[in-house]
Structures are given as C-alpha cells and as structure tokens.
C-alpha cells in the first residue's frame, strides 16, 4: 500500500471513529434511547441549581433551574406539578409545597417556575433568598390531572393569581397540538382570570399572544380594583360570569379551578349552583369540575 493510500485510510478511519464516538456520547446524553432523558423522580427529592432569576414585580419572579444535562427534560406530564422542599428556620420539619412549571418538556436543559412571594408563604419566601448557583430540592411528578388531547370538547378555566400556572401549561399544550401545527387537538378553551389590580395579571402578554394566535382560546379578565375605562369583569367571579363565559354543563366538558382557597371554595359552590357536578374534596381525573 502506498503512503498516500495509507494516509487516506487512516483519515477515513479517524472520521468513522469520531462519528461513532459522537453517536455514543449523544446516546448517553439522551439516555441511550434516542429520546431526551427525563430527570424527575416521584419518590426521591433531587437538587437542581438556580440558573437565572427574572423579577417580574416586587413580589413575583420567574426562577429558572438547570437540569443536569442540556439535553435533559423534566419529564412532567401536562397537568401535573412538582414538589419543592426546604428546611426553614422556625419550622419543626421540612416544608413541602407544590408548584406547576410554566415551561414544558419542549424546552430542554431547564425548567421555569413563576412564584409570588406571600408574607406567610414558607417556600415562596425561601425562594427569594436563593442566589444563583444555590440548590432547590424537587420531587415529582404528582397530581391527579394528566391532560391528553381531546379528552373533552370544551374546557372552562377559572384561575386566580398564580393559579394561572397549571392553566397556562394545559393551554400551551393544546395550542401546540392544533391541526395547523401537525397535531389533532381541537379542544375549545375559555379562561376567566381573576386578580386584584391590573398589575397583578401575571403573564398577560403571553396570554394575549396566545389569544391572537388561536381562535379556540379566549380570556376574560376580572379585577377587584379596575382602572378607569376597564371593560372586563369587576369584583369577584360570579355565577353569571361563569354562565356567560364558560361552557354549559355537559358530558363532554370540563371545568378547571386553581387559585386561593377562599376563591376555590366560592367557585365550587357557584359551579354546583349552575348545574355542574359537585366538586369533590379531592379531585379525580374523571371529574367534571377539577380543582388543582
């Protein structure tokens, strides 16, 4: 064999070897199956590092936590949530609270949490003390809701404050899976979103953009303290608002509720008075009125 041929053979083998190595490394990062690796563990807490913090207002922020590898995904079914745990001074045992990420498994390498810090909120206040590079203990997935495309014809949602997070997760999944996007989800969605002041309306720009993009999604805002010229709802969410804005009781509809406990209690009574099936103390997937 000539020196030229030998050199070409060596180069070819080097290229093939490099390609095989790249495939093996890629397979390792993707969990060996060609699919992104899911990192959530439903039985054990894991530490995730705070990567970014974006302050939306004086008491609301989006926390971005890094996953171990840039190709990893959280592995959170649509409609489910995660548990956050922390040891907090003055508390006799570890505090655990549930949150729904506003990101999805379509976004690899991280997950985002939208959190409002309440004066009496243990985990929400703890999050405000975290610095970039600090760890947060996370476990999941958990929850009775697992959304599947076309599980019902029409969904009516009532959200208050940060109760918008599980709703947004489902709304975005539905719109991503529309026929125009290569999917098959034709579910209609109507959302009543209640807040105290205009500045309390979280993720309003994103919601408005989704309304523009999708004619199967509508939002009705309700404010306790509306500004001059406000055209949305005023005060608390009423049975009349529900009757006018959300789907009427039927076998193929679902009402979803998420918000402060007093609001949820009132909405359970309101929906029952309008003929929807009475909400259970602990919701199940098949329930007509589902409380997160």
Swiss-Prot record:
It catalyses: 2 Fe(III)-[cytochrome b5] + NADH = 2 Fe(II)-[cytochrome b5] + NAD(+) + H(+); 2 Fe(3+)-[Dph3] + NADH = 2 Fe(2+)-[Dph3] + NAD(+) + H(+). Pfam families: FAD_binding_6, NAD_binding_1. GO terms for molecular function: cytochrome-b5 reductase activity, acting on NAD(P)H; NADH dehydrogenase activity; transferase activity. The chain crosses the membrane at residues 12-32. FAD binds at residues 128-143, 154-191. It is found in: Mitochondrion outer membrane. It is an enzyme of class 1 (oxidoreductase). One of its GO terms (biological process) is protein histidyl modification to diphthamide. Its cofactor is FAD. Residues 43-148 form the FAD-binding FR-type domain. Monomer. Component of the 2-(3-amino-3-carboxypropyl)histidine synthase complex composed of dph1, dph2, dph3 and a NADH-dependent reductase, predominantly cbr1. This is NADH-cytochrome b5 reductase 1. It comes from Aspergillus oryzae (strain ATCC 42149 / RIB 40) (Yellow koji mold).
């Amino acid at each position: 064999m000539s020196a030229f041929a030998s050199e070409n053979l060596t180069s070819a083998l080097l290229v093939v070897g490099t390609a095989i190595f790249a495939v093996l490394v890629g397979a390792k990062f993707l969990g060996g199956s060609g699919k992104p690796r899911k990192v959530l563990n439903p039985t054990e807490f894991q530490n995730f590092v705070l990567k970014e913090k974006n302050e939306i207002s004086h008491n609301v922020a989006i926390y971005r936590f890094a996953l171990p590898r840039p190709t990893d995904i959280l592995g959170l079914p649509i409609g489910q949530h995660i548990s956050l745990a922390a040891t907090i001074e003055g508390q006799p045992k570890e505090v655990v609270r549930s949150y729904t990420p506003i990101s999805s498994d379509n976004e690899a390498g991280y997950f985002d949490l939208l959190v409002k810090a309440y004066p009496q909120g243990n985990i929400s206040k703890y999050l405000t003390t975290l610095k970039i590079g600090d760890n947060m203990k996370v476990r999941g997935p958990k929850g009775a809701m697992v959304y599947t495309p076309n599980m019902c014809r029409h969904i009516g949602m009532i959200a208050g404050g940060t109760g918008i997070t599980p709703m947004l997760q489902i709304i975005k999944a539905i719109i991503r899976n529309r026929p125009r996007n290569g999917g098959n989800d034709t579910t209609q969605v109507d959302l009543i979103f209640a807040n105290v002041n205009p500045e309390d309306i979280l993720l309003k720009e994103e919601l408005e953009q989704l309304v523009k993009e999708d004619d199967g999604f509508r939002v009705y805002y309700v404010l306790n303290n509306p500004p001059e010229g406000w055209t949305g709802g005023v005060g608390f969410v009423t049975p009349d608002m529900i009757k006018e804005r959300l789907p009427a009781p039927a076998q193929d509809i679902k009402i979803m509720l998420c918000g402060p406990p007093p609001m949820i209690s009132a909405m359970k009574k309101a929906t029952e008075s309008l003929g929807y099936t009475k909400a259970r103390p602990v919701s199940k997937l098949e329930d007509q009125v589902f409380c997160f």
